[in-house]
C-alpha cells in the first residue's frame, strides 16, 4: 500500500463513558477495527446510514483516524498492520512484507508459516501459522500482560491480518477459504472452542 493512498481507519470504542475516561478508569471494552485502504471520508459520507449502536457509536464515543501515515517506505498490508498493532516501525516489529528473502541464508521466509504448529479443524498442511516472525508485542499482548483476565480476540478473513493484529497471546481466528469456516492453529489453542 502506498502511504498517500493508504487510509487506515482505526476505531477505538471505549464503552466506559467520557467521564470515567477523564478520571483514568480502565475501559471495560476496547474495540480496534482496521479497514485497510478504506477512504477516511466514507465515515462522514455514510454516517447517516450507521445505527446509533453501531459505527455511529464508534464515531461519537470512540476515536477514529482520518489521516494516518507511516514514516517509512514502502508500506504493505503486513507491515502496516504490524505497525498499527505494535506501535513501532518494521525495524522494531520485524515485519517487512508477507514474504521476504533472509539475506543471511538467501532462503525465502513467510511471515506466518510455522512448521512447528498444526492447523486446527482444517485439511492437513493448512493453517500451520503463528506470529513466529513478529518480534514486538501488540496492544493485545500488552493488555494481557497488564491483566491476565483480559480477553483479547483477533478475527480476520486472512491469517496474516488475524495473526499480526492479535499478536502472541490473543485468541486468533481466520477464515479457511477452502472450507468456509473459522480456524486457528495449535500455537493459540490445543483445540478450537466449541461454537
What are these regions (language model features)?
Residues 17-21:
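Sec/Tat signal peptide C-region and signal peptidase I cleavage site
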Residues 43-92, 151-155:
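Short, structured active-site-proximal loop/turn typified by the sulfatase FGly-forming signature C/S-X-P-X-R
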Residues 7-16:
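Bacterial N-terminal signal peptides
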Residues 23, 30, 35, 43-50, ...:
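Extracytoplasmic/periplasmic, Sec-exported soluble proteins
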Residues 1-5:
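Positively charged n-region of N-terminal signal peptides that target proteins for export
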